[in-house]
């Protein structure tokens, strides 16, 4: 079972579904409009995904537990607006980009809510802002003290995603 939270256009969920057809994939987003686009994209690419309106974990089925959780959530702080490319500011919905609490609101909510939706051995892979690595690592180390939590860099050497490996 795999879960994509904050799916937006569905690219992560669709890519996983096509590359790993054995996965049962669920993708959630707060925006019904984004989900409609994601669903269209999934249909056009023949990807099997269960699309749900979710607010972080609210709206997820209570009877499912996930092995893998991926997310490219809103993580940009309002203070970083000037660092953004004009095309992104012009064409991307602000709710898909910006998060409160210095861009960390989604990660804090996820760390509090996701535990009951995970299998005993699970992995979370979360895209982050290039200035957020240590903060997101700390959030998940506090929430899952037994987990291996690591930050990984992109080709430019900037923090790009945090991986949380849980083995209970």
Regions found by a protein language model. Name each.
Residues 44, 84-88, 142-143:
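Glycine-rich, phosphate-binding/catalytic loops in enzymes
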Residues 1-83:
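Conserved SAM/SAH cofactor-binding pocket of Class I
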Residues 101-164:
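Conserved Class I SAM-dependent methyltransferase catalytic core
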Residues 75-105:
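Mobile active-site "lid"/loop adjacent to the S-adenosyl-L-methionine
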Residues 12, 38, 72, 88, ...:
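Residue-level signal for inorganic ion chemistry
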Residues 67, 89, 138-141:
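S-adenosylmethionine
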């Amino acid at each position: 079972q795999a879960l994509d939270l904050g799916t937006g256009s569905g690219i992560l969920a669709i890519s996983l579904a096509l590359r790993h057809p054995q996965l049962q994939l669920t993708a959630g987003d707060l925006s019904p409009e984004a989900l409609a686009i994601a669903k269209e994209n999934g249909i056009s690419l023949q990807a099997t995904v269960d699309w749900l309106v979710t607010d972080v974990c609210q709206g997820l089925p209570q009877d499912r537990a996930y092995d893998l959780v991926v997310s490219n959530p809103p993580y940009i702080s309002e203070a970083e607006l000037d660092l953004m490319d004009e095309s992104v500011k012009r064409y991307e919905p602000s709710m898909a980009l910006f998060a409160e609490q210095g861009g960390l609101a989604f990660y804090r909510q996820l760390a509090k809510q996701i535990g009951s939706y995970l299998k005993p051995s699970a992995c979370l892979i979360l895209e982050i802002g290039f200035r957020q690595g240590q903060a997101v690592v700390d959030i998940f180390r506090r929430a899952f003290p037994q987990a291996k939590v690591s930050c990984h860099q992109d080709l430019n050497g900037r923090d790009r995603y945090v991986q949380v490996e849980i083995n209970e």
